[in-house]
Amino acid sequence: MRVDYDPGALGASAFYRLLTAVVVPRPIAWVSTLAADGATANLAPHSFFTVACTDPPIVQFTSVGRKDTLRNVEATGEFVVNLAPEQLFEQINATGVDFPAHQGEFDAVGIEREPSLRVAPPRVAASPVALECTLHSTLRIGASTLVLGEVVHAAVREDVIVDGHPDIRRLRPLSRLGRDEWGAVGEVRDLARIPYRDWPPS
């Protein structure tokens, strides 16, 4: 037996809670931006995040409502996606506080920054991965805005690379689940994709 839900009858807020409970786990884009005046560095977690394209390399995140991150990206055309590692759990959550626009999360939460190579917004110094992006385009959908950025530089900390490739067991990325739940890396399984020429498997 299944329980059926009608989005229209349930209402937007209740269906949001349902969607975020079943579309799991969701990787977190910890997005750093600069305000238009260049004086305030903002940092916020966004869990509606994924890769949109690999050639050209495009990542996307969704701003639910018009928040500082979106305004800054629209004004400057640049942002950095920092990987949200498990060891910074409390700080990541704290950067989700609705600070006023003039108060940057780096300073408010006490997060060390480092300069980016290709864009103006800083990177999170303690994050093992930073994807420096320039704005490709935005798409307004209802009250949300989909932000697509072209990755112009990627910086990966050396100690998380195994055999030339970032290793998830060393990256230890956080994810968002339903309600106030967060996920961490548990069991990792390796299973190669089966090419059609080898189907059915013996």
Q: Where do the language-model regions lie?
A:
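Basic, polyanion-binding surface patches
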Residues: M1-S202
